[in-house]
Each structure stands twice: as structure tokens, then as C-alpha cells.
């Protein structure tokens, strides 16, 4: 039976794995200026991808851009996923 178990996917805490993967901070080197116009579309695209795997409230996803230094901005993505018991 070990051979069959090899091909069977392992069950893991998928909400926790997704939460870890989606708590992303991306440092982006760029010139100073106003927030990029792509942020709303980025949030919408992220919601579409997350919705394929778990039901999530759009208000629970935030995307922000913070100017840290003159030439360093931080793009922060926070997604609060529902507990596994909620679905």
C-alpha cells in the first residue's frame, strides 16, 4: 500500500499554508511618486486566484505601497483567510 500512498496527496492545513504563502512583502526598487495605478487591478486578480481555492471576503485583502526610502518602496499584501472550520 505504500506505493498508493505515494500518489495520494497529503492533507495539510491548507488555510495555514495559503496564509503563509500570501503574507508577502515584496521590496521593489523604483523612483518615488504616487501609488501605481495597477494596485486595484492587482488586488482584483489576487482575489480571483484565492477564490479558486477558498471563499474569502474582498474586505479581508489589502494591498498597499509604502515608500521606505527615496528609491525603495515596499508592496505589502495581507490576506486574512477564514478558519478551516468556517467552510
Swiss-Prot record:
Family per record: Belongs to the MinE family.
Pfam family, one: MinE
Protein task: Prevents the cell division inhibition by proteins MinC and MinD at internal division sites while permitting inhibition at polar sites. This ensures cell division at the proper site by restricting the formation of a division septum at the midpoint of the long axis of the cell.
The organism's place on the tree of life at top rank: Bacteria
Keyword Cell cycle listed: yes
Segments passing through the bilayer: none
Name listed for the protein in its UniProt record: Cell division topological specificity factor
Amino acid at each position: 500500500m505504500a506505493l498508493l500512498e505515494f500518489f495520494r496527496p497529503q492533507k495539510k492545513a491548507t488555510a495555514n499554508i495559503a496564509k503563509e504563502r500570501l503574507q508577502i512583502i515584496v521590496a521593489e526598487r523604483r523612483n518615488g511618486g504616487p501609488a501605481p495605478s495597477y494596485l486595484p487591478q492587482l488586488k482584483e486578480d489576487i482575489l480571483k486566484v484565492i477564490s479558486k481555492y477558498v471563499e474569502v471576503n474582498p474586505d479581508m485583502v489589502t494591498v498597499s505601497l509604502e515608500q521606505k526610502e527615496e528609491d525603495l518602496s515596499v508592496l505589502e499584501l495581507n490576506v486574512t483567510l477564514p478558519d478551516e472550520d468556517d467552510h
